[in-house]
Amino acid sequence: MDSNTVSSFQDILMRMSKMQLASSSEDLNGMITQFESLKLYRDSLGEAVMRMGDFHSLQIRNGKWREQLSQKFEEIRWLIEEVRHRLKITENSFEQITFMQALQLLLEVEQEIRAFSFQLI
């Protein structure tokens, strides 16, 4: 993962962790956890692409690779919808900027994961 994406993830996670949403901190903590999980998954796919031979061992170790990939895309779609919803309801400019950047990052990561998965298939 390039350094800009890493710093974007870190920046957004840090800012989201400081936010106090009116609805529920549990919802936000869930989003943060999914962001972190998505980052780790994206990193592991990127590493597998770099070492194409490892993909075969990944498939052997994990016969449910495609199922996991499908699940990650569902998580991304859920996060995108959740971020869009938060963006619509928030009036705080700090939160709006954070959620706009989170949305942009999610769309970029979705594109990267798609590209990696096509290379691995």
Curated annotation (Swiss-Prot):
Positions in coiled-coil regions: none
A biological process from GO: exit of virus from host cell nucleus through nuclear pore
UniProt GO cellular component terms: host cell nucleus; virion component
Location(s), subcellular: Virion; Host nucleus
A matching Pfam family: Flu_NS2
Membrane spanning stretches: none
Ranges spanned by the short sequence motif Nuclear export signal, renumbered to the chain: 12-21, 85-94
UniProt keyword terms in alphabetical order: Host nucleus, Host-virus interaction, Transport, Virion
Matching SUPFAM superfamilies: Nonstructural protein ns2, Nep, M1-binding domain
Subunit structure: Interacts with protein M1. May interact with host nucleoporin RAB/HRB and exportin XPO1/CRM1.
Additional note from the record: Average number present in a viral particle is estimated to be 130-200 molecules.
Role according to the record: Mediates the nuclear export of encapsidated genomic RNAs (ribonucleoproteins, RNPs). Acts as an adapter between viral RNPs complexes and the nuclear export machinery of the cell. Possesses no intrinsic RNA-binding activity, but includes a C-terminal M1-binding domain. This domain is believed to allow recognition of RNPs bound to the protein M1.
Family named by the database record: Belongs to the influenza viruses NEP family.
Protein name, per record: Nuclear export protein
Species this chain originates from: Influenza A virus (strain A/Chicken/Hong Kong/96.1/2002 H5N1 genotype Y)
